[in-house]
Amino acid sequence: MIRLGVVGHLGYGGLPGVLAALRRLAPTLELTLSFEDSLREVAGPDAPVIEPGKVDVLLTLGGDGTLLRAARLDAGQEVPILGINLGRLGFLTCCPADMMEEALRRFAAGDYTVEKRMTLDARVLDAGGRDRAHWRALNDVVLHKGGFARVVTMRVQANGESVARYSADGIVLATPTGSTAYNLSAGGPVVFPTLETIIVTPVSAHTLALRPLVLAPSAEVLVQPEDGPEELLVTVDGQVGTTFAIGETLVVRRSQTPVPIVRFGEGSFFATMREKLHWGGLPERDETPRC
């Protein structure tokens, strides 16, 4: 039996129907189901809840944000994630809802591959050097201003060496997986998702002399704001974070625990870029996006 943990987004109207189809399908594929606690209102009060260490694969029903949340729930156990897209973009997910049955049949038959995606370890150190917050990021870690239209002046170091002083609205520290997220919007490079690098991209830099950097995965990056608005924030994968103060330090390095994402081999990263992000301007005809 394959132990399948289900993570879903209650905001999608089609979720109850997808869950009903999943529960009908599970016995035929020898799948045992458990659900995150928030899904019990649609999966049923008797639905078993996901227990850490007791699932073989996480099935996400939603969009990219749902997959990012599942990666955080995984807590570094390296459980493969199979993403079913119920949303609009679905860049990280594997396939749309109408292909869920085929995807699960192939997974049950062992007809799949796993891509191990690099993640980032992010820590906030207070003015005394004490660790006060800690996360793992699949996409990115962003230090940015809050509600005031005032730039942040910050010093960036890599492996103890000064890189530059940045004057910008913020800074994005991204993985290759996250290179097509906020990093891309901020003018950063697209990096093939299975590579291992740390991307440093300023947000609306107040100079023409600063450009994005691609660092070795072994780099330890320190960001120390020197001046700026009182309201600073650190945001991780666009979902969690904390306030941040002048005198504190953001430390980002490669995490030792990657996130395994299930793929089925059809299509390519570049086909997905063309189909989802309109890379190159015109999509190719009869093209299969990455799955």
PLM feature spans:
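ATP/NTP phosphate-donor binding region
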Residues: M1-V57, L61, D98-T113, V124-W135
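Gly/Ser-rich helix-loop-strand patches that form or flank binding pockets
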Residues: R69, D74-G87
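Short glycine/serine/threonine-rich phosphate/pyrophosphate-binding segments
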Residues: L15-P16, G65-A70, T180-S185
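Catalytic core of DAGKc-family lipid kinases
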Residues: L89-D169
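Short glycine-rich anion-binding loops that position phosphate/pyrophosphate groups of nucleotides
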Residues: G11, D64-T66, L89, T177-S179
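Gly/Ser/Thr-rich active-site loops/lids in small-molecule metabolic enzymes
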Residues: R165-A209
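ATP/nucleoside-binding phosphotransfer catalytic cores, i.e., glycine-rich phosphate-binding loops
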Residues: L143, N159-S162, A209-C291
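A residue-level signal for conserved active-site and pocket-lining positions in enzyme catalytic cores
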Residues: H9, L59, G63, N85, ...
